[in-house]
């Protein structure tokens, strides 16, 4: 039987993290790994009281590197798959159930997509990034994802640490390595507490658009997928 863990990167989510953990525990027996990205509130303490495995960052490293911390922990503990979801309550247990119920066992990555969310501007940006990058993914920024062991090994590597977000760069890397990806439709909820790490200010939005645009145009540059894949797997196994 496949060993699955849930990874939740979190920063200053004390208002929502208890409800998120309780909701998941009511539906699943999977270990819940909360990576506390140097929160200044009680996120860590609340997650610990709710029985989650808490991996604390001393410094704020961002949501993607927090996710990497969870991936490395899961690999070291022998998990075959992980589900990543947000700490703000956007991904209810029902969405995780939909993701698991519709996931294809042969895919290295399964994305829980919700095209109903997001503003018109965000949808326009998605279409532009899809065109520039060549990615055939509808919901580029969804944090609700199922990663199988091959994708986990690649994305836990030092080479993948260059990314700032769990979207275009991650998808491009897996695509370059010929890893299969699929999407399933899920229902998500609106964020009720906290602030978005990307959309909390115009400066952050512009920085994200520039960063993602450059990644999309570059497509991570030319390299031999199989050779790079073996290098990443070897590096991940040695860490």
Spell out what each predicted region is:
Residues 1-123, 131, 147-157, 165-188, ...:
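Structured catalytic core of nucleotide-sugar glycosyltransferases
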Residues 124-125, 143:
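Activation loop
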Residues 128:
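Membrane-proximal helix-turn-helix segments that form the acceptor-binding/catalytic region
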Residues 134-135:
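Conserved C-terminal "switch" segment of AAA+ ATPases
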Residues 138-147:
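Short glycine- and hydrophobic/aromatic-rich loop-to-beta-strand nucleating segment
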Residues 193:
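Glycine/proline-rich active-site loop of Rossmann-fold NAD(P)-dependent oxidoreductases
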Residues 200-202:
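C-terminal, flexible cofactor-proximal segment of oxidoreductases
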């Amino acid at each position: 039987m496949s060993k699955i863990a849930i990874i939740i990167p979190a920063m200053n989510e004390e208002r929502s993290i208890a409800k998120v953990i309780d909701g998941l525990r009511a539906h699943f027996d999977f270990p819940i790994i909360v990576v506390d990205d140097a929160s200044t509130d009680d996120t860590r303490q609340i997650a610990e009281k709710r029985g989650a495995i808490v991996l604390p960052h001393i410094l704020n490293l961002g949501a993607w590197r927090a996710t990497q911390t969870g991936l490395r922990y899961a690999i070291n503990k022998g998990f075959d798959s992980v589900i990543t979801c947000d700490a703000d309550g956007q991904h209810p247990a029902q969405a995780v159930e939909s993701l698991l119920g519709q996931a294809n066992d042969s895919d290295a990555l399964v994305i829980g997509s919700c095209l109903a969310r997001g503003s018109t501007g965000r949808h326009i940006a998605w279409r532009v990034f899809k065109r520039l990058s060549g990615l055939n993914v509808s919901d580029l920024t969804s944090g609700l994802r199922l990663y199988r062991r091959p994708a986990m090994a690649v994305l836990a590597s030092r080479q993948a640490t260059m990314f700032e977000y769990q979207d275009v760069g991650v998808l491009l890397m897996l695509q370059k390595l010929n890893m299969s990806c699929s999407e399933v439709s899920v229902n998500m909820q609106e964020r009720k507490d906290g602030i978005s790490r990307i959309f909390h200010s115009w400066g952050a939005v512009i920085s994200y658009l520039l960063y993602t645009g450059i990644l999309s145009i570059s497509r991570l540059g030319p390299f031999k997928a199989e050779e790079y894949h073996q290098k990443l797997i070897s590096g991940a196994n040695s860490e």
